[in-house]
């Protein structure tokens, strides 16, 4: 989870490769569609087979925006692995999220995909993924990668 007190933006990541970008609203909004951004990190990786759970189903259609945090974009990353790291650049409105398979950067203002980068081995040996647990060091690397990318876009 990441919260920016200046902009009122809240970004919440989940365990099925999804994260939601919300803005703080002082009034209830009209019914609206929330844009869904999908990103597949491993389409170009031969031999990769995801054996985990399926992504969450996202409810289609407009819904009433309540008072408080209102969703502005929903991002679904495939494979649907847990979101390990989130970063936000208020000056550019960029949101970065990292998983065990790579990272995604979206434009939080226009709700579009900016970049998706797979961080899996180029050799195609994915057998380590079967029972691989992410260590604190790996989480730190993902978080630093997100921060570095956002820093150099400023």
Predicted feature residues:
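A short beta-strand motif characteristic of beta-propeller blades
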Residues: 72-76, 112
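WD40-repeat beta-propellers
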Residues: 19-24, 103-108, 117
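Beta-propeller fold detector
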Residues: 31-59, 63, 114-128
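Surface loop/turn motifs at the tips and blade-to-blade linkers of beta-strand repeat domains
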Residues: 75-78, 118
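Non-catalytic interaction/regulatory modules that flank or connect domains
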Residues: 87-93, 101-102
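Canonical WD40 repeat/beta-propeller blade segments in eukaryotic WD-repeat proteins
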Residues: 1-3, 42-55, 77-88, 125-130, ...
């Amino acid at each position: 989870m990441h919260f920016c007190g200046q902009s009122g933006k809240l970004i919440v990541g989940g365990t099925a490769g999804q994260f939601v970008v919300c803005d703080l609203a002082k009034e209830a909004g009209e019914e609206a569609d929330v844009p869904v951004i999908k990103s597949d990190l491993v389409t170009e990786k031969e031999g990769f087979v995801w054996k985990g759970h399926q992504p969450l189903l996202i409810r289609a259609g407009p819904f009433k925006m309540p008072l408080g945090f209102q969703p502005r974009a929903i991002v679904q990353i495939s494979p649907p692995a847990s979101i390990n790291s989130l970063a936000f650049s208020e000056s550019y409105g960029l949101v970065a999220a990292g998983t065990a398979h790579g990272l995604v950067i979206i434009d939080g203002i226009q709700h579009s995909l900016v970049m998706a980068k797979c961080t899996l081995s180029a050799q195609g040996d994915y057998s380590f993924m079967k029972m691989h647990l992410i260590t604190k060091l790996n989480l730190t690397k993902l978080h630093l990668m997100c921060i570095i990318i956002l820093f150099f876009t400023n």
